[in-house]
């Protein structure tokens, strides 16, 4: 039977998913499995590398079983992954030497501070497009090498491999046959030069990582590995890889200069397509590789919010004011406004445009009249307010005035949040019919490489609008919200600094 589907593996921060797409980019089947979050110390976040892959393999099989689809019907596999999360494993056995250190983890903040004192921040930003922060992979690799007994010696002897989650999944799907990554993931490690498209020896020396550990960097859309026949009954090409946010940008058909999307997931991630050359930021945005296709490199400006939808999980699991995430919109809608309450969810610091790793969460403006609804409303509004800070910074960097913002991710289904986002930004907020754009993006990349789809024009034609939210808030109300929000951010800033 001729291949009729692309299988996208979407390895996220809290769950692994497999999503089957047909030629019209419709979702045929979804399978999902959550995995364990490990918090060894305050500010530390880890995953089990084996559980990451095992959960991904399970949903791969479950998706095909539920869809009643055989391996012969799969044209290609695409892989999207949580970025920056760092895994180090033994080359000979494939055994991890330590848990995966997750992108949210802050244990290397002091090392990054020292690099800043040593004058390395400018070199790193100039070569990588990134700000010097514990968020990125390089300092996490160094921590493993310095703190796992014997790891540094093994790495120096060429016995250890490093990879972001995409590399780890490909390594295991290929039965240890292929050690690769793509430029979108490599550009998030703080070790990759986005101007030369190569690992950079000066950066590797700064973070103390041997080059022998690093994966080969291959185009995001290319025949880059073979899935071992054990998984599909035959060899199937892995033909698309991208970090989750770059994948979502591609899946939202933001393929042209000036188009932007925001993903409302665990964090919020706004990417603005800046075309075929990197654009340096003067306003604390990240310059990153968007993807590499047959047409060459595309770049983006990115603003990263560490805590977006995760604030909803905190209200559910930490405070217990909701029992299920689906209750959030209803509860926030029980009050007409935030009642003067502002929440800054800086649980692990503030991301763009502040990059304050010592900020911590605050709720300000509480009175005896404050209720659960006000807290829920303030949390909802905080997601959109953080996004607006990023949009304002990007417009200063580029001079590009957005006319629309495409959205995806779980929280994009919250109509109150989307309307509030439109009101704040003053532009149309467009939610697509298929909000699984992360998976769709790597399906597109894999499909392009294998001829499943012909070109990007065909892909753009497959994007369909579900709902458009138009701004309607009076300007004076918007100005008041922004003024009070920035006052609240000032209260949260530098909280842990002595």
Curated annotation (Swiss-Prot):
CDD domains: FGGY_EcGK_like. One of its GO terms (cellular component) is cytosol. Coiled coil: none annotated. Glycerol binds at residues 83-84, 135, 244-245. It catalyses: glycerol + ATP = sn-glycerol 3-phosphate + ADP + H(+). It holds the Pfam family FGGY_N. ATP binds at residues 13-15, 266, 309, 313, 410. This is Glycerol kinase. The gene is glpK.
